[in-house]
């Protein structure tokens, strides 16, 4: 009598054996050492770089660094002849740089490994003994490990950092957010994130003063809002309009319950724009960078900016809603930084504008000055707490990291701010800001 589990066990055994026999052929194994001369062309962040022979124009795998002896393995988009700035669209090891003579290797077991020269493991694809036979760069910038049937075992599209190429997604069960770079020199996670939430896409700022990230944008209603179900995927798409030659609609499509829906049209360049990526910048702004491979000179351009007066497409936001618009502190009106709010009134704004630092948590050591007709970047996309004004102030008093509070007398709504940055001028004089300042 045949055991009821015999057939499934036998099939599993043969499947395991077939995977173990599917080795990377010797002519497809690689080992690249991070050494030698640097490239000569302009790159983002004023980096130095070493190209690797894994490419599909205009994409190429490289080592690059912005600080001595601290390299990132990355994919760039641009080609040398175009005199266009090389931009980084994917990174393997943000925050864990490798040094000179580090190695990138794909052995016969099919695991792609980035290691220091002493063998210390820095990053890997986790694909050992999973049937990988080849590494390949696809025309869309997706670097993939393939099995003998040409199916993806691993793909770079599954691990975005601060950028999404056309066809790349944020997805439930995988990476659900983009995170900004800290600075041009420092390649670690920065304070900004673009997050796929259950029913919308939101931008957050994480301040050292705040216990949790502060939301400063949540997609407009004409982006998309999910009333039933949950967002499972958001994908950057480029749809060529056959009625308009090569004009391309660049959209953020969204998926709910397995069905993809058309999202907001962010931009509509009048040429084939499939070589586009969405970037969450160091400054917390969202931009589309588009590369026109039919142009020899300066083929790369910005085709969308979220916080920008120039891209008035209906899917953009006022620059005044952008936390970084007026630096550490300032009042913004009609996209311009117009004043520095002080206890003596509104003074001329400059980049040196800054609220006075309160060094003590004792309420007797500080007071507040009032600024009328203002909102904070928190107020538009975060629900205020229903409190009396004196209770709102008390809440700020009890928080040593609170720098001020914002209050709307109509509705008795309170927002406590652990970061000031850009204040927004509004016509309603019942919208008030109270800035904490030391007693002299």
Give a label for each model feature.
Residues 2-440:
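Beta-rich ligand-binding surfaces for carbohydrates and other polyanions
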């Amino acid at each position: 009598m045949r055991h009821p589990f015999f057939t499934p066990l036998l099939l599993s055994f043969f499947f395991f054996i077939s995977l173990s026999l599917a080795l990377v052929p010797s002519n497809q194994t690689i080992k690249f050492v991070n050494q030698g001369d640097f490239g000569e062309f302009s790159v983002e962040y004023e980096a130095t770089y070493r190209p690797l022979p894994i490419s599909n124009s205009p994409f190429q795998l490289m080592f690059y660094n912005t600080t001595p002896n601290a390299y990132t393995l990355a994919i760039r988009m641009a080609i040398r002849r175009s005199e266009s700035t090389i931009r980084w669209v994917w990174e393997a090891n943000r925050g864990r740089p490798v040094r000179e003579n580090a190695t990138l290797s794909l052995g016969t077991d099919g695991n792609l490994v980035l290691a220091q020269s002493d063998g210390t493991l820095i990053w890997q694809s986790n694909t050992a003994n999973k049937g990988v036979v080849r590494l390949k760069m696809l025309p869309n910038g997706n670097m993939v490990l393939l099995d003998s049937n040409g199916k993806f075992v691993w793909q770079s599209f599954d691990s975005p950092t601060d950028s999404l190429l056309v066809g790349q997604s944020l997805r439930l069960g995988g990476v659900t957010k983009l995170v900004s770079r800290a600075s041009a020199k420092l390649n670690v996670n920065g304070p900004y994130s673009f997050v796929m939430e259950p029913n919308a896409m939101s931008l957050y700022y994480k301040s050292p003063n705040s216990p949790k990230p502060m939301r400063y944008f949540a997609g407009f209603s004409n982006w998309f809002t999910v009333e039933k179900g949950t967002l499972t995927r958001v994908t950057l798409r480029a749809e060529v309009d056959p009625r308009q030659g090569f004009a391309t609609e660049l959209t953020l499509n969204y998926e709910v319950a397995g069905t993809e829906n058309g999202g907001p049209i962010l931009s509509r360049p009048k040429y084939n724009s499939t070589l586009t990526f969405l970037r969450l910048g160091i400054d917390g702004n969202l931009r589309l960078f588009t590369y026109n491979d039919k142009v020899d000179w300066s083929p790369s351009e910005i085709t969308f900016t979220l916080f920008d007066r120039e891209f008035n497409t209906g899917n953009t936001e006022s620059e005044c809603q952008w936390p970084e618009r007026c630096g550490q502190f300032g009042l913004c009106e009609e996209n311009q930084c117009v004043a520095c709010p002080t206890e003596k009134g509104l003074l001329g704004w400059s980049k040196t504008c800054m609220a006075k630092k309160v060094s003590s948590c004792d309420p007797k050591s500080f007071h507040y000055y009032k600024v009328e007709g203002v909102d904070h970047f928190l107020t538009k996309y975060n629900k205020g707490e229903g409190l009396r004004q004196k209770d709102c102030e008390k809440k700020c008093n009890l928080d040593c990291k609170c720098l001020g509070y914002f209050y709307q007398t109509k509705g008795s709504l309170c927002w406590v701010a652990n970061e000031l940055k850009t204040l927004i001028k509004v016509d309603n004089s019942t919208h008030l800001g109270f800035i904490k300042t030391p007693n002299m």
